[in-house]
From Swiss-Prot:
Belongs to the polypeptide deformylase family. It catalyses: N-terminal N-formyl-L-methionyl-[peptide] + H2O = N-terminal L-methionyl-[peptide] + formate. One of its GO terms (biological process) is co-translational protein modification. Its EC number is 3.5.1.88. This is Peptide deformylase. One of its GO terms (molecular function) is metal ion binding. Removes the formyl group from the N-terminal Met of newly synthesized proteins. Requires at least a dipeptide for an efficient rate of reaction. N-terminal L-methionine is a prerequisite for activity but the enzyme has broad specificity at other positions. The active site is at 134. It comes from the Bacteria. It comes from Chromobacterium violaceum (strain ATCC 12472 / DSM 30191 / JCM 1249 / CCUG 213 / NBRC 12614 / NCIMB 9131 / NCTC 9757 / MK). Fe cation binds at residues 91, 133, 137.
Length: 167
């Protein structure tokens, strides 16, 4: 397994709309394993392929405290949404930035597992939020882009300042 490089906002590659996965081969299995390793190392709970510059519709997720409930969503699609909730989100592509985002409270998602087998899942709570957040990535949207223009500008300024300090 290998650690992958996580793209950081405002990298334009994060705005790429991912293409469907069509081939379920050993290379895909390796990509999935590498994404889990990268997500765990970065202490994340979800990672979309777009975030590691792999522009296919693939998400890995594990919201458990024990880190033992791996979930893989390939070609995911939200088919139902219900309710509304506000949750403070963070993102591995926007390190150190957290803000409240409005999302559906419950979702139903259709996807394929790592072997290509179709499944449906109804989710609420943190799982529903995480699914929506990661699917945004597959559609080229970063969570901060769901905030007001003023907040987006403040975040960009903060990130630029941080980048200068790290040089």
């Amino acid at each position: 397994m290998a650690l992958l490089n996580i793209l950081h906002y405002p990298d334009e590659r994060l705005h790429t709309v991912a293409k469907p996965v069509e081939v379920f081969d050993a290379a895909l299995q390796q990509q999935i394993d590498d994404m889990f390793e990268t997500m765990y190392e970065a202490k994340g709970i979800g990672l979309a392929a777009t975030q590691v510059d792999y522009h296919r519709r693939l998400v890995v997720m594990d919201i458990s405290e024990e880190r033992d409930e791996r979930r893989v969503f390939i070609n995911p699609e939200i088919v139902e949404k219900d309710g509304e909730t506000v949750y403070e989100e963070g993102c591995l592509s926007v390190p150190g930035i957290y803000d409240k985002v409005t999302r559906a409270e419950r979702v139903k998602v259709k996807a394929q597992d790592r072997d290509g087998k179709p499944f449906e899942l109804e989710a609420d709570g943190l799982l529903a939020i995480c699914i929506q957040h990661e699917l945004d990535h597959l559609n080229g949207v970063v969570f901060v882009e769901r905030l007001s223009q003023m907040k987006q500008q403040r975040i960009k300024t903060k990130l630029k300042k941080r980048e200068k300090q790290n040089m």
